[in-house]
Amino acid sequence: MVWYLSGLTCTHANVTEKGEFRSACAALGLIFVAPDTSPRGEGVPGDPANAYDFGLGAGFYVDATQQPFARNYRMWSYVTEELPKLVAENFPVDPGRQSILGHSMGGHGALTVALRHPDRYRAASAFAPIVAPSQVPWGIKALGGYLGDNKQAWRKHDTVALIEDGARASGLLVDYGDADPFLTEQLRPELLQAACEKAKIPLTLRRQPGYDHSYYFISTFMSDHLRWHAARLKA
């Protein structure tokens, strides 16, 4: 079973409509699970200024502690506890064979979830992930808005910080496009590379020439990631 966490502004439908995962999953015998990116519905608060990078479509895979978001924005618990339980109760899955990947904000979510649950996920990969949210504008806004000013709480949702604090993985696969407009300000893959080198975590970091941040990029390399996951899930 492969979990896929989507990025800012997305719902589950972005990857289910544009992700090009079906053929590879069918051939590899994988179940593909794609959660939403935030709570939805009447009464769920969004960004006060209706910005795209906070609130609806931008849950950042944390359990909010700040009001008015704490009641609804519990995306960490949703993707690590509530939804896995629901899936296991209703589908023929093997809980001992799970892996996780994601894009952008979802890449951040996938990597942090995997690092904090190393015994649950056999593989983790990401497309253009936000690897150090504590150090970039998207992450500073989201972590501050959901978790408040406690920077120690932020570190639990920051891939680079988790690695610095001792979290480990057997290996990571990360792709990014060198034409991604968010590369230098928001994504900063060089920080992940440095952290993994220092911690001796095997990292395959691939720079894809000419690709941007879009689903053209994701769909091109999705089957490659799924084959990488399948090899580890079936080992």
Segment roles from a protein language model:
Residues 1-235:
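Non-catalytic cap/lid and distal C-terminal segments of serine-dependent acyl enzymes
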